[in-house]
Amino acid sequence: MNTLMFFYTLAILVICIVTAVLSLATYASSRRRFFIYGSGVFICYAIEMTEIFFFEYTLQNQSFPASDYYSITMPVLRTLVATASQAFIWLIAMDLLDKHSKKLFVIPIATFLLSELLIIVAIPYGPMHQWLYYTMRQVFLVFVGLYIFWTAHKSTKVELKARVNNQKKHLIIGAILVGCIVAEDFYNILVVPM
């Protein structure tokens, strides 16, 4: 089973890197910023996977408490990478909505970063601390999805409504996946910790 998980993780890492490179190549030919932002998301995910992979490798053949399985190792790096990843996702949403305000970009990202830092500093370490830390990402993604739909609903621009409507299926699938991640984290971290 360990060998299977090793190759699974390695495959995900390779897919992230290849997708990031392909996104950059697509940007080079199309000049659509969307592809730069998408590449950024995949690069951030690859960095995070590498950090997890490294942590698991260094603890190989060493016993550690089951409660540490979802521990927040290297919280500064992890928080900065998560914030960068969320920033790229937010840039994709802003690009979809044709929004270009620096203030609109900074406020949600700063709020996410401050929320993560507050959880690290203010919540006592334990399962609830871990669950809140990881769930903030899903909370941010829910915010992004709701903001997209709210902006499209409120808009009088037919083109914007059509653009968002074209992405409706992807946004719904994303919302379902976010719900699954929250349920999985809730179950694995709070209900039956390893």
Locate each region found by the language model:
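Transmembrane helix-loop junctions in multipass membrane proteins, especially transporters and channels
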Residues: 28-31, 57-64, 94-100, 124-128, ...
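Hydrophobic transmembrane alpha-helical segments in integral membrane proteins
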Residues: 1-18, 134-138
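Membrane-helix boundary/juxtamembrane motif in polytopic membrane proteins
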Residues: 101-108, 131-136, 152-180
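Hydrophobic alpha-helical transmembrane segments of multi-pass membrane proteins
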Residues: 9-63, 74-87, 109-121, 171-193
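Short juxtamembrane and helix-loop transition motifs at transmembrane-helix boundaries
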Residues: 1-5, 64-74, 93-103
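Membrane-proximal helix-loop-helix units in multi-pass membrane proteins
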Residues: 82-150
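Non-cytosolic membrane-interface motifs at loop->transmembrane helix junctions
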Residues: 64-76, 128-140, 194
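Alpha-helical transmembrane segments in multipass membrane proteins, preferentially the mid-helix core
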Residues: 19-24, 88-93, 121-122, 141-169, ...
